[in-house]
Regions:
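Active-site mouth loops of central-metabolism enzymes
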Residues: 1-11, 61-68, 155-165, 225-228, ...
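N-terminal beta1-alpha1-beta2 module of alpha/beta enzyme domains
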Residues: 1-59, 158
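Hydrophobic faces of well-ordered beta-strands that scaffold small-molecule active sites
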Residues: 3-7, 28-30, 55-59, 86-90, ...
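Acidic-and-aromatic substrate-binding clefts and catalytic sites of carbohydrate-active enzymes
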Residues: 7-12, 32-39, 63-69, 187-191, ...
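Short, acidic/polar
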Residues: 9-20, 74, 164-172, 328-338
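Acidic (Asp/Glu)-rich catalytic clusters
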Residues: 18-22, 44-55, 75-86, 174, ...
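Alpha-helix-loop-beta-strand connector modules within alpha/beta enzyme cores
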Residues: 41-58, 113, 120, 364-375
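An alpha-helical appendage that flanks or caps ligand/catalytic pockets
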Residues: 103, 107-150, 191-338
Length: 375
């Protein structure tokens, strides 16, 4: 099992990534949401410059945030700083688009973008379209093409992983990606892996960039964790602070499905959505009574994966916390055993800020990683 820390990109995260590397974490994942976090590539660049072994990945980059040659150049540049340690996780967009009042990207556009990105990172010529114009593009100053190696690095492979929960997304994972990113909220790994493997078989795709079994995708599950201290309850203030903000985004998605502009996320619960709509109206009106109703989504996504808004804790239940890797060291280890048994290769553990990162790094590193790896 690989162990990752997942960070809502704050620019000084390199300090926590450095500590995570020392504690035995194998991966650091960075969120890409331009209106609520620091720039993901700038944050990764600092982490790359200040670490030696830990792998660095986006979780996940959003196609509409940057045209494909910009994303390719960014990833290849980080790969120059951290050769062979870069992974591009990519998805159709949740907060990266919902914070702009937009739904997730359509699958046809998404597939085209992923295919072009992989082509560019593999040093190929790619047909790029802007409006009604189609033009061939490539990373011109790669070492192989120009002899220069001071701009970026595509000689060391950069795996591209696709985030997907539904069947159409899983089809794309199998057809063109190097691995699969999903969430621990609705654990669909046992059903998803066979579908992805079948899609890969039909298209002739291989997952060999991660080594091991080339026919099975490398699977990363995004979740969160808090190692309970002796006598501590899952409902403690510390657990709520560290884990709660990673759970309410699911409620935000339910609100979007019923009331917001990002209605194609596929996460719906009308009852919870109605309760949250009532809450967010009261919260927004208290904060700024003059906020127009058509900007309500801006209040919804405040605090996303970073903190709980006042009153938002009522949407974090013990049942939701139980779905995360929160518990005693023995309980967490048992959950990891189960995840490993169903084909999960990497757990990406969300933190909300540097304080929660340092707590997780210390507790999970000492009581889980060290015990399981013997290091």
């Amino acid at each position: 099992m690989d162990y990752g820390i997942a960070i809502p990109s704050y620019i000084d995260a390199w300090k926590d990534v450095q500590a995570a590397e020392k504690a035995g974490f194998t991966h650091a994942w960075f969120f890409d949401s331009q209106l609520i976090y620091s720039d993901v590539w700038a944050t990764m660049a600092l982490a790359a410059q200040n670490t030696n072994r830990i792998k660095l990945g986006t979780l996940v980059a959003i196609p509409s945030n940057r045209i494909v040659p910009v994303t390719a150049a960014a990833a290849a540049t980080i790969n120059k700083l951290a050769p062979g340690r870069v992974i591009v996780g990519i998805g159709t967009g949740y907060t990266g688009r919902n914070t702009m009042g937009l739904p997730a990207l359509k699958m046809k556009e998404f597939k085209t973008y992923v295919s072009q990105l992989k082509g560019l990172l593999d040093g190929k010529d790619v047909l790029f379209q802007e409006g009604d114009k189609e033009r061939w593009i490539k990373l011109i100053h790669s070492k192989e093409n120009s002899g220069r190696d001071d701009f970026y690095n595509i000689e060391d492979p950069i795996p591209v992983m696709v985030a997907a929960n539904g069947p159409k997304g899983q089809e794309i994972v199998g057809e063109i990606s190097d691995g699969w990113i999903t969430t621990g909220r609705s654990l669909n790994v046992p059903e998803g892996i066979p579908k992805i493997m079948e899609s890969a078989k039909r298209s002739g795709n291989s997952f060999d960039r991660f080594g091991g079994n080339a026919t099975k995708p490398y699977v990363t599950v995004l979740t969160s964790s808090c190692v309970l201290r002796e006598g501590e309850a899952v409902s403690s203030e510390r657990v709520l602070r560290n884990v709660g903000p990673t759970l309410v985004p699911g409620v935000h998605a339910m609100w979007e499905s019923s009331f917001g502009p990002g209605s194609n996320l596929g996460i719906s619960n009308s009852s919870i959505a109605e309760d949250y709509d009532k809450y967010i109206k009261e919260y927004g009106d208290k904060k700024n009574p003059s906020t127009p109703p058509d900007r309500r989504y801006l209040d919804v996504h405040e605090g996303h994966y970073a903190y709980l808004k006042e009153g938002e804790e009522k949407f974090v239940s013990n049942d939701l916390i139980a779905r995360t890797l929160t518990g005693t060291p023995i309980e967490i280890s048992e959950k990891l055993d189960y995840l490993e048994s169903i084909g999960v290769n990497n757990v990406a553990l969300s933190v909300v800020d540097s304080r929660s990162a340092q707590e997780l790094i210390k507790d999970f590193g000492e009581k889980i990683i060290s015990e399981r790896t013997g290091l």
